[in-house]
Regions:
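Short, charged, surface-exposed hinge/linker loops at domain edges
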Residues: 1-8, 45-100
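N-terminal segment of the canonical double-stranded RNA-binding domain
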Residues: 1-19, 31
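Residues that cap or initiate secondary-structure elements
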Residues: 17, 29, 88-90
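Short acidic, gly/pro-rich beta-turn/loop elements at beta-sheet edges
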Residues: 21, 33, 92-94
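Short, proline-centered helix/strand-breaking motifs
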Residues: 24-26
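A short, exposed loop/beta-hairpin motif centered on an aromatic-Gly-Thr core
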Residues: 28-39
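Conserved anionic group-binding/transfer micro-motifs
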Residues: 40, 44
Length: 100
């Protein structure tokens, strides 16, 4: 099966005053955080790339992303679509494996 070049998944950003922004991928059972929105988005992309690479390497099923309109959010939460370009992730991971 051909691997996808790009994945796009919803992430839920949770805002609590005085705390980092929590980021959860409901479809992937994965979470991260960031000091601000920019940092949270970068962390989310990095996490998404790692999770998807792991699923591909394990030949695990890739879950379908939940449509944004199906997410149930609290007042302090926002849904954000996060994308990752996998060819660069795969290259970086294979280079990392060779260098070890």
């Amino acid at each position: 099966m051909k691997k996808a070049d790009r994945y796009l998944y919803p992430a839920v950003f949770t805002y609590v005053p005085g705390q980092e922004i929590a980021v959860v991928f409901p479809d992937l059972d994965a979470a991260t955080c960031g000091a601000d929105e920019r940092d949270a988005l970068f962390s989310a992309r990095e996490l998404l790339g790692c999770v998807m690479f792991g699923l591909e390497e394990d030949h695990a099923p890739i879950p379908a992303p939940t449509p944004l309109h199906d997410l149930v959010l609290a007042e302090n939460e926002r849904a954000v679509l996060v994308d990752v370009y996998m060819p660069s992730i795969r290259t970086a991971q294979s280079s990392r494996s060779v260098n070890r």
